Amino acid sequence: MAHKKAGGSTRNGRDSESKRLGVKRFGGESVLAGNIIVRQRGTKFHAGVNVGIGRDHTLFALTDGKVKFEVKGPKNRKFISIEG
């Protein structure tokens, strides 16, 4: 009789759920106050004019207007602002 030994249990086969990070509203898009602009880990993008920052570094609009991305400062940081 042909026999095959039972396979051992594997220690792989797990992965974490994706966190859906990234830019949610792009440059030139209209936003309403409270709209999320970017979900991020750390400050990859910094809050500019009329943009608030949540405790998980989420950037959101404080006023209605259009999204503007800009690079400024001595460290060439990326800022996101809302233009009324």
From Swiss-Prot:
Keyword Ribosomal protein: yes
UniProt keyword Ribonucleoprotein, yes or no: yes
Gene3D superfamilies (alphabetical): 2.40.50.100
GO process annotations (BP): translation
Pfam families: Ribosomal_L27
Cleaved signal peptide residues: none
GO cellular component, one term: cytosolic large ribosomal subunit
Keywords: Ribonucleoprotein, Ribosomal protein
Record SUPFAM superfamilies: Ribosomal L27 protein-like
GO molecular function: structural constituent of ribosome
Disulphide-bridged cysteine pairs: none
InterPro entries xrefs: Ribosomal_bL27 (IPR001684), Ribosomal_bL27_CS (IPR018261)
Stretches for region Disordered: 1-22
Protein family according to the UniProt entry: Belongs to the bacterial ribosomal protein bL27 family.
Protein name: Large ribosomal subunit protein bL27
Organism the protein comes from: Shewanella sediminis (strain HAW-EB3)
Gene that produces this protein: rpmA
